[in-house]
């Protein structure tokens, strides 16, 4: 992706978030974006929208199906994407919208990797640790299970990481023995 395309994607995302923020609709916008992104992840919609083999009329039909029960701002955004023929960048634009919402609201997704699934109590403790250590509000809690950690956990928020895994501690111990 070129710098020009990246700047375009970020500008579309930033503009949509600004409009929603002015109208106090960030939560609604975030829900709309997450629902559409889920559609992208469960289908090959991104490939269809970015393919030159798919006619523009088909892309219009696909995006019309996405409109559904979205907010006015999201539907207007999708119409704008269609008018400017930027369908190929929609997935990246929606990702940019989520990033911009996180920046504006200081609410970031939290990824927790542990050797075993977390209990509800542990999840609430993770949210408290994130709020205290990272000074951000925890958004979605994305849980991953990796038995190779042996024990402990890895918390990742906004490109910052806390790694208390036994695996890392063993690696550090091994390096100290050398």
Curated annotation (Swiss-Prot):
Keywords assigned: ATP synthesis, Cell membrane, CF(1), Hydrogen ion transport, Ion transport, Membrane, Transport
Quaternary structure and interacting proteins, as annotated: F-type ATPases have 2 components, F(1) - the catalytic core - and F(0) - the membrane proton channel. F(1) has five subunits: alpha(3), beta(3), gamma(1), delta(1), epsilon(1). F(0) has three main subunits: a(1), b(2) and c(10-14). The alpha and beta chains form an alternating ring which encloses part of the gamma chain. F(1) is attached to F(0) by a central stalk formed by the gamma and epsilon chains, while a peripheral stalk is formed by the delta and b chains.
InterPro entries: ATP_synth_OSCP/delta_N_sf (IPR026015), ATPase_OSCP/dsu (IPR000711)
UniProt KW Transferase keyword: no
Subcellular localization: Cell membrane
Function recorded in the entry: F(1)F(0) ATP synthase produces ATP from ADP in the presence of a proton or sodium gradient. F-type ATPases consist of two structural domains, F(1) containing the extramembraneous catalytic core and F(0) containing the membrane proton channel, linked together by a central stalk and a peripheral stalk. During catalysis, ATP synthesis in the catalytic domain of F(1) is coupled via a rotary mechanism of the central stalk subunits to proton translocation. This protein is part of the stalk that links CF(0) to CF(1). It either transmits conformational changes from CF(0) to CF(1) or is implicated in proton conduction.
Encoding gene (name): atpH
Membrane topology: Peripheral membrane protein
GO cellular component annotations of the record: plasma membrane; proton-transporting ATP synthase complex
Classification via Pfam families: OSCP
Gene Ontology terms, MF aspect: proton-transporting ATP synthase activity, rotational mechanism
Family: Belongs to the ATPase delta chain family.
Protein name per its UniProtKB record: ATP synthase subunit delta
């Amino acid at each position: 992706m070129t710098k020009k395309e990246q700047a375009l994607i970020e500008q579309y995302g930033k503009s949509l978030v600004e409009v929603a923020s002015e109208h106090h609709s960030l939560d609604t916008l975030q829900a709309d974006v997450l629902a559409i992104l889920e559609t992208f992840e469960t289908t090959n919609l991104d490939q269809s929208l970015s393919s030159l083999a798919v006619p523009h009329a088909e892309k219009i039909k696909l995006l019309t199906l996405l409109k559904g029960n979205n907010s006015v701002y999201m539907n207007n955004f999708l119409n704008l994407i269609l008018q400017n023929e930027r369908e190929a960048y929609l997935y990246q634009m929606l990702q940019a919208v989520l990033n911009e919402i996180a920046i504006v609201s200081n609410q970031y997704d939290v990824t927790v990797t542990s050797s075993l699934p977390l209990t509800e109590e542990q999840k609430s403790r993770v949210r408290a640790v994130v709020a205290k250590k990272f000074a951000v509000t925890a958004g979605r809690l994305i849980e991953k299970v990796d038995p190779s950690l042996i024990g402990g956990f890895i918390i990742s928020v906004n490109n910052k990481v806390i790694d208390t895994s036994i695996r890392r501690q063993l690696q550090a111990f091994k390096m100290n023995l050398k």
